[in-house]
Structure formats: C-alpha cells, structure tokens
Regions:
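N-terminal cap/lid segment of alpha/beta-hydrolase-fold proteins
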Residues: 1-30
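Short beta-strand element of the alpha/beta-hydrolase
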Residues: 32-40
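Conserved Rossmann-like nucleotide-binding pocket used by diverse enzymes
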Residues: 37, 63-65, 109, 132
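The serine-hydrolase catalytic nucleophile loop
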Residues: 42-54
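Catalytic nucleophile-loop/oxyanion-hole region of alpha/beta-hydrolase
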Residues: 45, 72-103
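Conserved alpha/beta-hydrolase
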Residues: 54-76
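Primarily recognizes the serine-hydrolase "nucleophile elbow" in alpha/beta-hydrolase
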Residues: 94-132
C-alpha cells in the first residue's frame, strides 16, 4: 500500500463562470487510474466519507479528485441558485480539467445525491469504465 504522494488544492474554472474548489490526491507511484468523486447533498469534498474513500483508494494506487458542488464548501456561488443540471455540469467541468491536465477519469464515484449526478454524467465521459 502506498501513501498519498501529493494533495493538491485546485481551483477549476466552471463553465457557468464560477470556480469549483477541488482536491486531487495522488499515490507515490504512477496512478492505476483517475477517480472522480461526487459528494452527497449539502455535504462537501472534505466530509468524512469522501476523505476516507479517497485515502483508501490512494493507498491502493488510484488518484482521486473530489470537489465541492457549486454553492457548497469552498466553491463559488449560492447553494440556492444551484440545481441538478448545474451539479452535473460541475462534474463535467472537473472531468474536463482532469483530462486536460492529468488523465480523464475512468472511474466515477458518487455518494447519495452525488451518485445520481454521477449516473447522469457517466455517458458523457467516454473514458469512464466504471461507476460506483
């Protein structure tokens, strides 16, 4: 098992003009794959479930990006102005960022509400091989 090599705090430009706060954790060695994690309704990228899942996957050699949906955590915007479509777009924006700067996610993980957003997004990310 490898420990996290890096924990990068990222600011991803959202397609709606609002920045998305994200964290990318990578293992010591070349990642087996990149994972994009979507949190539950009104939670955030740093909640206990997201952090534990991320640490576990990094220990197994995966790189994991988790982010705050718009209006939550450190992401810009007002929660009251968000909806399911804007959350799906946040996922696509994060996927595009990974593709451009690292490697597109091949695994999407969603917790509760994040799971619904992941299912709605999976077909639009051609590299996705698995959804949890």
């Amino acid at each position: 098992m490898s420990m996290a090599k890096q924990r990068l705090k990222l600011v991803i430009p959202g397609s709606h003009g609002l920045n998305i706060a994200a964290v990318l954790e990578t293992p010591e060695l070349e990642p087996k794959a990149y994972v994009l994690y979507a949190h539950c309704f009104t939670c955030g990228k740093d909640n206990m479930a997201a952090s534990r899942v991320s640490r576990g996957l990094v220990a197994q050699g995966f790189a994991v990006m988790r982010f705050d949906f718009g209006g939550l955590g450190a992401s810009e915007g007002e929660f009251a102005d968000t909806n399911f479509s804007s959350n799906v777009q946040n996922l696509k924006d994060c996927s595009d960022y990974l593709r451009e700067h690292y490697q597109a996610p091949s695994i999407l993980i969603g917790h509760s509400f994040g799971g619904a957003a992941v299912l709605a997004t999976a077909g639009d990310i051609k590299e996705v091989a698995g959804v949890v």
